[in-house]
Amino acid sequence: MGPTALTFYRAAKRLQALPRLANMVATVGDRLHNSHVDTKAVLHPTVELGYGGIGVIIAPGVEIGAKSFISQNVSLEPLPGRVGVPRVGRDVYIGVGAQVLGPVVIGDGAKIGANAIVLDDVAPGTTVAGIPARELKQKVPPTGT
């Protein structure tokens, strides 16, 4: 399949001691994939991007936890007029075209539907969808005795 947006992100992160080269590598990745994964974002090594990260925008400061999957054309960015960026937990699925905006926290195991616009926190294990995103289903934790 060739290099993905994550390949260029990781290479640029490793080259940060050489800022001009890191910037050049990041720019090539951005242009090839019509995306931008900022090197100031923190992505766990097990994060995956759908279709190589085509159209994905991940702003500086965004944190994405282990085993999370970000589909193509997803935006994780600040909301104009509000301070802060999204934080995505572990094992989160974000569907095609979704936008997660502002200082929201996406809990572990949450699922975000295609084209959803998330403006509020999403509880762990919750499925949300719609514009604006609203809860569709919440995973019931097992009860122990």
Question: What annotation goes with each model-predicted range?
Answer:
Residues 39, 44-45, 50-51, 59-60, ...:
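Left-handed beta-helix
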Residues 1-35, 133, 140-145:
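Terminal amphipathic alpha-helical/low-complexity segments used for targeting or macromolecular assembly
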